[in-house]
Amino acid sequence: MPCYFWDCWPSLEIRAVLCAMGCIQSIGGKARVFREGITVIDVKASIDPIPTSIDESSSVVLRYRTPHFRASAQVVMPPIPKKETWIVGWIQACSHMEFYNQYGEQGMSSWELPDLQEGKIEAISDSDGVNYPWYGNTTETCTIVGPTKRDSKFIISMNDNFYPSVTWAVPVSESNVAKLTNIYRDQSFTTWLVATNTSTNDMIILQTLHWRMQLSIEVNPNRPLGQRARLREPIAQDQPKILSKNEPIPPSALVKPNANDAQVLMWRPKYGQPLVVIPPKHR
């Protein structure tokens, strides 16, 4: 099922739970009631307090896996008197991306979002590419079809992380000699908890989160496979921020393309013209 219901109300006293590395943040205070009587009991957000893991098992690519960003919310939808449908769920957009793979003095490959980089849009959708504008349609959303006679109480959750592959060799070279020397990544996201009336397209923002993932990996391509890469600061990620005041959703965060379909892989040599290695899926 796309959402999980419970029969009894949890306590309205919401406690902030913070582990030693600040791994969980929770909105405090009383439950908040929004338009249409929608109530948010609790919102939690965290990034797992573990370092990025590095995998050198392949002679072709280096793989790394970042810790997960996680968010969950407990929501109560009052009875819906009319024949209408509401969807409550998570919408996410990327507002900043730097993703460089350095190959010594030869140059670097770079995953880029041109419209975002050039300031044409404020943010780009991070939808799954199918269920726009939602991040996903399993645990990430809950659909309530009216009319209903009683409160609908449910939990919705989402998680996100990076697990890419980076070639040891220069991506535009026919050589398979390892030249990779550094990986740098810095991405920022805004995540909204939203309720939408599909009949009227009315959209209510219930909560806004900010989070960021930073990564730096130093690589010595001359060392044996399995001993080349070393994670540099930051080892632990900053924890997400649950905003006290909601932010509006940019129109570009609600429509195609999503970040995966819009990104392009460039080769930027130290000398010479940049080359498109992988064009965007969406043109």
UniProtKB/Swiss-Prot annotation:
Annotated InterPro entries: FAM78
Top-rank taxon: Eukaryota
Family the UniProt entry places it in: Belongs to the FAM78 family.
Protein name: Protein FAM78A
